[in-house]
UniProtKB/Swiss-Prot annotation:
InterPro entries: 4-PPantetheinyl_Trfase_dom, 4-PPantetheinyl_Trfase_dom_sf, Ppantetheine-prot_Trfase_dom, Thiolase-like. Keywords: Fatty acid biosynthesis, Fatty acid metabolism, Lipid biosynthesis, Lipid metabolism, Magnesium, Metal-binding, Multifunctional enzyme, NADP, Oxidoreductase, Phosphopantetheine, Phosphoprotein, Transferase. The keyword Cell cycle does not apply. Pathway: Mycotoxin biosynthesis. Belongs to the thiolase-like superfamily. Fungal fatty acid synthetase subunit alpha family. The gene is hexA. It catalyses: acetyl-CoA + n malonyl-CoA + 2n NADPH + 4n H(+) = a long-chain-acyl-CoA + n CoA + n CO2 + 2n NADP(+); a fatty acyl-[ACP] + malonyl-[ACP] + H(+) = a 3-oxoacyl-[ACP] + holo-[ACP] + CO2; a (3R)-hydroxyacyl-[ACP] + NADP(+) = a 3-oxoacyl-[ACP] + NADPH + H(+). This is Fatty acid synthase alpha subunit hexA.
Amino acid sequence: AAAWMLNGCLQVMDSRTIPANRNADNVDPALQTATHLCFPTRPVRVQDVRAFILTSFGFGQKGGQVVGVAPKYFFATLDEEVYKDYSVRVTKRSKTADRAYAKALMSNAIVKVQDHSPYEQEDQSRIFMDPLSRITEDAETGSYHFDTKDIRNVADVKARLTRLVRGERLNARPDAASGLAQAARSAQAWIEKQTGGRSSVDTSTVGIDLVDLSAFSAHENETFIERNFTEQEKAFAKQSLDQKMAFASRWAAKEAVFKCLHTQTKGAGAAMKDIEIVKSDNAPQGQAGRKAGLEDIQLSISHGEDCLIAVAIGIAGNGPAKYTL
């Protein structure tokens, strides 16, 4: 609804015409005392529209306001060189858009409806379970699909980690960027060690999870701890000097292993006790059911100043489950 209203406000600013509401024939008398409110029954042409304000009320008592200001006031703040550069780019963009619109009109394809899913049926659960899966467009046909190379193996796990960190950096606080980069470098080094620097490895699944420690407070929730951590995990965390870090790292590891296993989820509130992260001599070790056809799951937890990244790589196979992580 807000997007619909925003489009209308932009049209008002562009056309300098206030639209009519011919159905507003019973305005509450209490509103008639507000002299700054106007409910026109016919379109009103004005000389200029300098700004507008849009208010949207959503479900759950959540709402927002948008203030739109006429472009000329923005352009007036730009240096001449910056304005000229912008003018060149916007002219080029407009010409490209005009050509695309004309082509769509002539081919009767303004709205392109795809009559099939962008993924194969056997890949559906992998797509939905992988937060890093991305759709791509076929330049020749204009159809959309998921790249099977991106979801059926982990040869590009380093690229996937890079995309995740890049996305988190956009949302991170300025003072958290260095810690995120530190954790990413540590995770990258572990991946290089596990893959031996090869461009592809004999893997089938991957799970990556990132936790912002400044926003993590689940360790204070006893119900959360009871539902998601085993007795051994709780004992380990409560013996740690930093219980928050201990619970956060185990939780990130559980999430990464869960994504790696590609098991059918029971919902966002499902307990995670079925996956246990225990401490071994060399690295954290995960214990979980053999439902994903994996012989081994390699797991790493990398720490930054105020965040941590867990990476789980699943090794395909039908042999005895090692799960030496």
